[in-house]
UniProtKB/Swiss-Prot annotation:
Protein name: Ornithine carbamoyltransferase
Catalytic class of the enzyme: transferase
GO molecular function, one term: ornithine carbamoyltransferase activity
Reactions accelerated catalytically: carbamoyl phosphate + L-ornithine = L-citrulline + phosphate + H(+)
Native organism taxonomy: Bacteria, Bacillati, Bacillota, Bacilli, Lactobacillales
EC number annotated for this UniProt entry: 2.1.3.3
Protein's UniProt keywords contain Aminoacyl-tRNA synthetase: no
UniProt source species: Lactococcus lactis subsp. lactis (strain IL1403)
Binding site for L-ornithine: 164, 227, 231-232
Length: 333
């Protein structure tokens, strides 16, 4: 059912297929915890292409590949000539002749689409400018682990509503039957074509989509999600974003409005919640702020599941690689 398929964006898989993958990841997590080997990709070779730097995505793909018995090979921006001295199409054909599967984390969705088309191998999107599908598997796995189900839960995303994480949450939630509220300034709301796509899937799953500017949309949330205010490559926009998003910070006063006191707080990381990074020390010096998108109090509260969420990147990446490359017996669903 999954064999040989790429995972470039969330709509590549149906609702039932995504739910199957989430349950498969939960199973693989149990195997990992019980030290039971699961080498479904024994002696496979995996190319890990990273145009953008990464902590969780690189660590997750590397660890997942090794656990599955595969050999991961990291290819950073200084290692290959992707689109510079060699076209992406030519690179795809070369890598496809040497590797069994390819991960890509980069700047353009069109690049990962070309890799998948011309390599002839399963390609997995580790993040592009538009979508972050492997993050979504981890996010909704984490949500299911905490609530036992997904249908009819409400997730409120607060912050930069037009970045890849917001796009992916909006569409994936709509596919899976999760109500999604995006709370952001009008200038940072999801593109209309993304909203239209999400509403199409929400009609099928009977979920609700809400795009708004006020934080009152948090009251009925079961999940509160935020992300950095300035994405990689947008550093020149820092002052403008802080001005736009300062009132959208997730802090104790904001979360006290939430009716469900057992809500969970999520963040795909890294997070600027304290002064323990060089970036935040500069922010403190230039803008006199100790925290940005979330306060340290909320980030480290009992409601926060950010580190479970990060761990689940590895389990879900493992699951999608095994399902698409492992020649496993998976009944049709």
């Amino acid at each position: 059912m999954f064999q040989g398929r790429s995972f470039l964006k969330e709509i590549d898989f149906s609702k039932d297929e995504l739910l199957y993958l989430i349950d498969f990841a939960i199973h693989l997590k149990k195997l990992k915890k019980e030290h039971i080997q699961h080498k479904y990709l024994l002696d496979k070779n995996i190319a890990l292409i990273f145009e953008k730097t990464s902590t969780r995505t690189r660590a997750a793909f590397t660890t997942a590949a090794v656990d599955l018995g595969a050999h991961p090979e990291f290819l950073g921006p200084n290692d290959i000539q992707l689109g510079k001295k060699e076209s992406i199409s030519d690179t795809a054909k070369v890598l496809g002749s040497m590797f069994d599967g390819i991960e890509f984390r980069g700047f353009k969705q069109s690049d990962v689409e070309i890799l998948a088309k011309d390599s002839g191998r399963p390609v997995w999107n580790g993040l592009t400018d538009v979508w972050h599908p492997t993050q979504m598997l981890a996010d909704f796995m984490t949500i299911k682990e905490h609530f036992g189900h997904l249908q009819d839960l409400t997730l409120a995303y607060v912050g930069d509503g037009r970045n890849n994480v917001a796009n992916s949450l909006l569409v994936t939630g709509a596919i899976l039957g999760v109500n999604i509220t995006i709370i952001s300034p009008e200038s940072l709301q999801p593109a209309l074509e993304i909203q239209k796509l999400a509403r199409k899937y929400a009609m099928k799953s009977r979920s609700k989509i809400s795009i708004r500017t006020d934080l009152n949309g948090l009251e009925n949330a079961d999940i509160v999600y935020t992300d950095v205010w300035v994405s990689m490559g947008e550093e020149a926009q820092t002052a403008k974003r802080i001005k736009l998003l300062k009132s959208y910070q997730i802090n104790q006063k904001v979360v006290e409005k939430i009716i469900n006191k057992n809500f969970i707080f999520m963040h795909c990381l890294p997070s600027f919640h304290d002064l323990n990074t060089e970036v935040m020390k500069e922010i403190k010096e230039n803008y006199n702020l100790n925290e940005l998108e979330v306060t340290d109090e909320v980030f480290n509260s009992k409601n926060s599941v950010v580190f479970e969420q990060a761990e689940n990147r590895m389990h879900t990446i493992k699951e999608v690689m095994a399902a698409t490359l492992g020649d496993l017996f998976i009944p049709k669903i």
